[in-house]
Amino acid sequence: EELPDPRASFAGHTLETPWTELQLAYFAGCAMWTYLTLPFLLAEPGITAQEIEPWEESGEQWRRLAVTFPANIATHSTHQTLYIGNDGLLRRHDYDVEIAGNTPGAHYPSDYVEVQGIRFPTRRRIYPRQADGKPMTEPLVVSIDLGDIVLR
């Protein structure tokens, strides 16, 4: 089976539209590539980032970075927002999943481990995001747990 233009194959999809196995592989590949390469991905040519007003959540104030990706980088959406804690770690990552009808998501990376001097979140939870920017606590849309991270 082949999917020559995977992104175009999602035209007209909503969150409820079923995906083929190849569409799932495309999305999972884009998602994990983005998740594992941030913040280094931000150094790529054509990506723009601008600090915007801070955000209060869970008794903390997080700095926010509005990021715009060029068309040549396959990712969830052109416009994304990163939330950075006082320790410099990514606390939240917002995006609208363009291939699923621009479904808004609030992604929470946590449980960081250090591998060869680089911090990686081993737990990721993604929830629907409301119009006011606040996450819904249910339903849990995506759950990712990583272990045994090795850099070669």
Language-model segments: residues:
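Broad, structure-driven detector of short, well-ordered beta-strand segments within folded domains
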Residues: 1-2, 82
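Gly/Pro-enriched, hydrophobic low-complexity segments
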Residues: 60-152
